[in-house]
């Protein structure tokens, strides 16, 4: 499945009944040399790919963060006070929840709820 940003905006509006206030794109990457050495201080020769993951977001009036993905059916909604507790069963939302948890660990106050929609073109790992 391929989508453009207009289709992603429409999908966000269908899911949350409002417009996204920001859209982000994180390109996938491959390492031509140096696989798994970059996070250990080693050298790598990566290149960005034209496919990756999109994130659409807007603040909400609730004290919770809502996570949806167009790639999987599971939808998650967490109170702001739950953002440091991982979800059970290897839930996909644990990845973005972990980002929020690390911000909080570093003293960033998460005081606003958000409605978040993900869509990615990268292959998903299987267990």
Specify the residue positions occupied by each region the protein language model found:
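ATP-binding N-lobe of GHMP and related small-molecule kinases
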Residues: 2-127
């Amino acid at each position: 499945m391929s989508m453009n940003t207009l289709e992603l905006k429409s999908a966000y509006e269908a899911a949350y009944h409002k417009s996204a206030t920001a859209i982000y794109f994180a390109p996938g990457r491959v390492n031509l040399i140096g696989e798994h050495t970059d996070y250990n201080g080693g050298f790598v020769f990566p290149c960005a790919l034209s496919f990756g993951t999109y994130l659409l977001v807007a603040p909400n009036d609730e004290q919770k963060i809502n996570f949806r993905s167009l790639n999987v059916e599971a939808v998650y909604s967490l109170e702001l006070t739950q953002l440091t507790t991982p979800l059970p069963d290897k839930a996909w939302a644990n990845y973005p929840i972990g980002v929020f948890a690390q911000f909080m660990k570093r003293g960033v106050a998460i005081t606003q709820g958000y409605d978040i929609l993900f869509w990615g073109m990268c292959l998903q790992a299987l267990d």
